[in-house]
């Protein structure tokens, strides 16, 4: 019989406004900026086609399968308020398009090719709805929030961390000394910076050994369980696993991975190893702003956060709302809830386009890090709540008396804020008062308050692109 060759409009096949989404569909919300003259329906359908079964022309092998069963469908289009040339295209993908348990395959399909499409000026993936049928094919976080608290025996407050600075250039022994001083002063965790791997000035094995010594010494002296995020990120998966195995042999509680630069395949392998071997896994989001900072093109961080919860990690950096790195309060709390909670309702005011049911997938602790110090403690305690890690790098190591007093100042400030909150005080209104009261009996906190009182990072965002 032959077939009708030639180029055809995508919207004839892939724009289906009458489609009723299934419980098993993966749903995507794209912010689409089409080229002038391209109608919204055609642009939305093009996104659905190019990220599923479509190609630019009709091919005879289309007749050998059921396109209706496997194609993505653009089922709804809505304008973006305040933007003339933009709209949100909602696309539904049948579950059979995706390999089970593979974030790599999911992203290769949904965002792998379509972002370079000529008919679009810009394209941004704003949100994904992951159905329970797909969620259940992932292991998710190695342990989750409750198991982590049980391992650490720490309840009822946020956890405290510190990134060791300067991030590059210290010898392993001096690095270990800084770790010991911070943990001894009262922090729960210290952290390798994301770009500390295995450089000529400090090879990974030396760092692991000195940090392990620091952890066990601080534990013995304080009676608290301590940890240091040993960065296992490496140039090959085999080398990464070798570092994870060595960390486990040392008996440390937690390791770390840069999940975007390391890649989802490596991250999922590492998360599986951590679950099998009792290691917690801290995740750094290095490179995220390359993908998520532009509001018209790329991918929103809430999508990367969902992907991490599926791939596996017990902590992930999530912005601060109050520090030096960008993060709008409602939007940030939207993806913080997506990391921690089992069920999150659709709420467009917080950027959540779909109701997300994680069924029994464990939660991830959000990490607030970047330009924060003791005066931020009341706001951070109120915004992030107990299930979070508050991480002060310069805010610990920049203390005028040294690392250990810097750690003491942070711990005293945190305990004061938690106690005040538990007594029913309003942290938002009385925050400075609470810190000032605590500083009267903690000289370390008083010194920290004096040095950082005037520091603020409240710049207006300059990006309007």
From Swiss-Prot:
SUPFAM superfamilies (alphabetical): RuBisCo, C-terminal domain (SSF51649), RuBisCO, large subunit, small (N-terminal) domain (SSF54966)
Keyword Disulfide bond: yes
A Gene Ontology term for the protein's cellular component: chloroplast
Enzyme Commission code(s) on record: 4.1.1.39
Subunit structure: Heterohexadecamer of 8 large chains and 8 small chains; disulfide-linked. The disulfide link is formed within the large subunit homodimers.
Protein family membership: Belongs to the RuBisCO large chain family. Type I subfamily.
Protein name, per record: Ribulose bisphosphate carboxylase large chain
Organism field: Dillenia indica
Gene coding for it: rbcL
């Amino acid at each position: 019989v032959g077939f009708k060759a030639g180029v055809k409009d995508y919207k004839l096949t892939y724009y289906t406004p009458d489609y009723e989404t299934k419980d098993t569909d993966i749903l995507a919300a794209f912010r689409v900026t089409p080229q002038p003259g391209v109608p919204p329906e055609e642009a939305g359908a093009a996104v659905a086609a190019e990220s599923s079964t479509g190609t630019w022309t009709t091919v005879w092998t289309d007749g050998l399968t059921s396109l209706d069963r496997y194609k993505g469908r653009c089922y709804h289009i809505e304008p973006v308020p305040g933007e003339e040339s933009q709209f949100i295209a909602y696309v539904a993908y049948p579950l059979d398009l995706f390999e089970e348990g593979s974030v790599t395959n999911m992203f290769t399909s949904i965002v792998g090719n379509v972002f370079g499409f000529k008919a679009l000026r810009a394209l941004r993936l704003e949100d994904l709805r992951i159905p329970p049928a797909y969620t259940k094919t992932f292991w998710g976080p190695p342990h989750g929030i409750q198991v982590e608290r049980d391992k650490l025996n720490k309840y009822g407050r946020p956890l405290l961390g510190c990134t060791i600075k300067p991030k590059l250039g210290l010898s392993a022994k001096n690095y270990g000394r800084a770790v010991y001083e911070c943990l001894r002063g009262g922090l729960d965790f210290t952290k390798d910076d994301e770009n500390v791997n295995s450089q000529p000035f400090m090879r990974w094995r030396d760092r692991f050994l000195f940090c392990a010594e620091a952890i066990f010494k601080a534990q013995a002296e304080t009676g608290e369980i301590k940890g240091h995020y040993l960065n296992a990120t490496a140039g090959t998966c085999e080398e990464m696993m070798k570092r994870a195995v060595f960390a486990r042999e040392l008996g440390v509680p937690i390791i770390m991975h840069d999940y975007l630069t390391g890649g989802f395949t490596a991250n999922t392998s590492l998360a599986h190893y951590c679950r099998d071997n009792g290691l917690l896994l801290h995740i750094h989001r290095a490179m995220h702003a390359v993908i998520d900072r532009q509001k018209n093109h790329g991918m929103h961080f809430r999508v990367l956060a969902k992907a991490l919860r599926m791939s596996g990690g017990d902590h992930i950096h999530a912005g601060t709302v109050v520090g030096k790195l960008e993060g709008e309060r409602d939007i940030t709390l939207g993806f913080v809830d997506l990391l921690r909670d089992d069920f999150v309702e659709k709420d467009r005011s917080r950027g959540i386009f779909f109701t997300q049911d994680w069924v029994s997938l464990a939660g991830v602790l959000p990490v607030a890090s970047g330009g924060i110090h003791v005066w931020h403690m009341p706001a951070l305690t109120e915004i992030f709540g107990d299930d979070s890690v508050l991480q002060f790098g310069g805010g610990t190591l920049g203390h005028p008396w040294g690392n250990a007093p810097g750690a003491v100042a942070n711990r005293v400030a945190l305990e004061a804020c938690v106690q005040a909150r538990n007594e029913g005080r309003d942290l938002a209104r009385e925050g400075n008062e609470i810190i000032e009261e605590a500083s009267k009996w903690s000289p370390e906190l008083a010194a920290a308050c004096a040095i950082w009182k005037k520091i603020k990072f409240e710049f207006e965002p300059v990006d309007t692109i």
